[in-house]
Amino acid sequence: MAHLLLLHGPNLNLLGTREPEVYGRTTLAQIDAALVDRAQAAGHVLHCLQSNAEHVLVERIHAAREDGTAYILINPAAFTHTSVALRDALLGVGLPFVEIHLSNPHAREPFRHHSYLSDKADGVICGFGADSYRLALEAVIARLERDA
């Protein structure tokens, strides 16, 4: 049994109502519930946290090094394009991570094309709406089974 950490960045608490044509109508609570259930069915525990504050996400990443977290799944949202702090935190704890995006940032405004995390992530899954999270979790579960 592995402990997994799912982090959601700024404004993702508004999922379901914020720009549904871009992000869909599925709420964050619905995404989290489905992923917690899927992780549990695979014999793992998934812990979820959403924050609009960069330092809260950084502190949770730091805590992951000591609390038995095996893998981090992260949708950094707008912090993707700005946060050296998240990058440094992820590198500092040395845990594998997957970067997730609901939309395809490469098909959007040019300022969204750069990620401070992608080159260090085990993988990046984007553009599949709420399914991006499910696909990321399935990839992590497969990786854990392969490495067991």
UniProtKB/Swiss-Prot annotation:
Residues in the signal sequence: none
A Pfam family this chain is assigned to: DHquinase_II
Domain of life the protein comes from: Bacteria
Site, as annotated: Transition state stabilizer: 18
GO biological process, one term: quinate catabolic process
Keywords, ordered alphabetically: Amino-acid biosynthesis, Aromatic amino acid biosynthesis, Lyase
UniProt record similarity statement: Belongs to the type-II 3-dehydroquinase family.
Function: Catalyzes a trans-dehydration via an enolate intermediate.
PANTHER family: CATABOLIC 3-DEHYDROQUINASE (PTHR21272:SF3)
Protein name: 3-dehydroquinate dehydratase
UniProt organism field: Xanthomonas euvesicatoria pv. vesicatoria (strain 85-10) (Xanthomonas campestris pv. vesicatoria)
Gene coding for it: aroQ
